[in-house]
Amino acid sequence: MKLAAIFLVSCVLLSLLPSLTIAEKRPWCPTRKQIFDGSCNRTDYTQCFNDLRNTWDDIGDLCPTDCTCTPQPQNKRLCYCRYLPCPST
C-alpha cells in the first residue's frame, strides 16, 4: 500500500514538472502598423520601433525588429514593425 501511494505521488509530481520548467511565452503578432505625427527620420532606424513600443504598456526590452517608416500626407508617417510581441490585454 505504501509503495502504491509513493508511486502515485511520484507520478503527480513528475506530471507537474514540465509545467514548472517551461517559461510562459508571450504571443507574437504577425505585423504591427500605426500612424504617427511627424516625418520619417532617415538617420534613426529605431524611430518606429520606439514609437510603437511607447504606445504599449509593457512589451519588455527588445531589439528593433524589421521596422520601416513610410511618409504619409499631412506630415504623418506610417510605422510598420513585424514580429513585435502583442501588447497584453
UniProtKB/Swiss-Prot annotation:
Q: Where is it chiefly localized? A: secreted
Compartments annotated for it: namely: Secreted
Matching entries from Pfam families are given as: SCRL
Q: Can you tell which superkingdom this protein's organism belongs to?
A: Eukaryota
- One GO biological process from the UniProt record? defense response to fungus
Query: Which stretches are annotated as coiled coil?
Result: none
InterPro entries for this protein: SCRL
Which cysteine residues pair off into disulfide bonds? 29-86, 40-69, 48-79, 67-81
Keywords in alphabetical order, please.
Antimicrobial, Disulfide bond, Fungicide, Plant defense, Secreted, Signal
Q: Does the keyword Protease apply?
A: no
Family in the record? Belongs to the DEFL family.
Q: What is this protein called?
A: Defensin-like protein 250
Q: Which organism is it from?
A: Arabidopsis thaliana (Mouse-ear cress)
Encoding gene per record: SCRL8
